[in-house]
Structures are given as structure tokens and as C-alpha cells.
Amino acid sequence: MNAVTILHVVFAIFFWATGVTIMGVYNVAIVVAYQGILMLIKKKKTYLAYVLTCIEVVVHAVLATLFVGFSSGFQVYCVAMIAVSCYITFVWECFKNGTRETLLFSLFSMFGYFVCYVLSLYCEPIKPVHEIAQTIMYIVNALFMFIIIFCFVMLLFWDINHRSDRLAAKNNQLDEMSKKDPLTK
């Protein structure tokens, strides 16, 4: 959550620096909201925390697209959320139907991406920013997207390998016990 907070502080600075004050204020509000989401996680309300996070990412992408345009790249976080959803629904125990929930969260993220795209076709940005600022923000957003995807895929691989190693160790332990147990001979 700290990384998400830092990311939204970066967004707030970008928006204020480019004169999109309302999005700067929105990002400060999101920083505060993420502190509340962190409290939900501490209270073991992880399902609600993740649902709120998914909604926030899509809403932020849509608002940023409306204000500064598709070319700034805020919609790429919807793509990153697919990798996050795969990891979270696999690891967090509150997700009982991992595959179904992964699909639902991923579809919601894809929907958000395409809403941003359609908005860019039919709506001019409310507060267009200079082309250089757009390019810089697109590069920053794409870089963060790749980092998020890489980190969550690596976490997923690590978790799968860890579970596999634990299962193999348990099987070895059971094999050893069965060799000593007269009932299994």
C-alpha cells in the first residue's frame, strides 16, 4: 500500500504541475482513502479492501483520461490490475472462488481500459496538458505498469514454488512415516 500511496503523490504533483488542480486534489484524497483501505486490511476485511482498490484504479483511469487524455497513459493501470488480480485471488484466503474472481476482476479492469479508450475517441480532454508532459507521464505510467506486472508475476511464481516445496516436504514426511507404520506395510 505504501507504493500505491507514493504513486498517487507522484500523480498529485504531476497534476498540480500541469494545472489540473482538481485531479491533484483527487489524488491527495486517494492517498487518504488508501490509508483507510490499509485499515481494512489490518481488520482482516481484505475482500472489501481489494474491491475498493479495483474500483479506485478504474475510476482514476477514467477521470485521468477525461481530464488529460488517453495519451497520458493512466489507463495502463487497468492492464496491470490483471496481474494483481491473479496474484491476490490466488494468495489471499478470502477469495474462495479464485478463478471466477480473477476473471471478474480482470474483466472489470479490461472494461475500465476500454471505457478510457472510447472516451478518448468521443471526448476531448477537459484540461489538455502540453505534449511533452503527456509523453513524460505516458512513459512514467508505462514504466510503473511494467514494474507492477513484473513484481506481481514474480510474487505469484514465488508463492507457487513455495507451496510446491511445502507439499513435496509434506509428502516426503508422510512417506517416511508410512515406512515406519506397521499398518501401511
Task: Please place each PLM-identified region on the residue numbering.
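The first (N-terminal) embedded transmembrane alpha-helix
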Residues: 1-7
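Alpha-helical transmembrane segments
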Residues: 7-10, 35, 147-154
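Juxtamembrane segments at transmembrane-helix boundaries
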Residues: 8-128
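Alpha-helical transmembrane segments of polytopic membrane proteins
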Residues: 24-30, 135-145
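Juxtamembrane or sensor-core-proximal signal-transducing alpha helices
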Residues: 124-126, 143-169
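Conserved nucleotide-binding and Mg2+-coordinating catalytic segments in signaling enzymes
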Residues: 175-185
